[in-house]
Amino acid sequence: MELFVEKDSIVREIWGKSDTVLFIFAGASAEFALNKAVDWLYFTGKLPSDPLGRLFSTVKYAKSIVFSPKDDANASIDVLRKIHGKVEQNRGTQIPDWAYRDVLFMLIHYSIASYELLETKLTYDEKEEVYNVFHRVGTRMGLSELPLNYKDWLPIRESHLKENLKQSKYTFDLFKQYKKHLGVLRYKVLIEAQKLVVPKHVKKELYLNDFSLLTIVIPIYKFSRNIKIDKFFKNILLPAKYKTEIKELDIHPG
């Protein structure tokens, strides 16, 4: 049975840990809010009405691709494309191709940044492997103009950040929704987490400084994993109604 991502792949290591995945989506939540195509997320109303539920459903989809046999993963990608196609049909216009690429680029960047923050620096080959996996996802979705390798992707990623991110009314509303659904303390943690993984251009657009209070906390959290109390911290940081979803983040299917 051919797997979409090999069992010894660094991508499985990254997406098999709940804390890494949570940092991936902390970063993506900041970048999403600035994307010039963020209005698409408001068209269905799902993200602003339940940002955490949307997060966990997206995680579930990503994990179903990373940890599945190749045929099943491709089928999941095809379904994802059909879902977006239906939204496009309902709105009567197409999601720009660059917007699809932006989402793919987020997954690449934050997979690498989050793992390096919480675990260890990745080798160039490992970064190339991360890029290759998501390149295959993008290719299956029919995206064009995808760089062939990680090295060629880096300057394209930088140009996407400068061209496609800008503050809008949706930016401020989305952060308002984050705060509403997380509460003041958890929202503060989200902001501090974003500071650690978002690119400089995102920080500039969101007026985020370089210092994060989590710089002090992360070494303590890493130690907590060694003595198996990290779940306690996760339960504190996320609302109780998402306990099942939090637990499932550490389940490695396939």
Describe every region a protein language model picked out.
Residues 1-254:
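Mature, function-bearing regions of proteins
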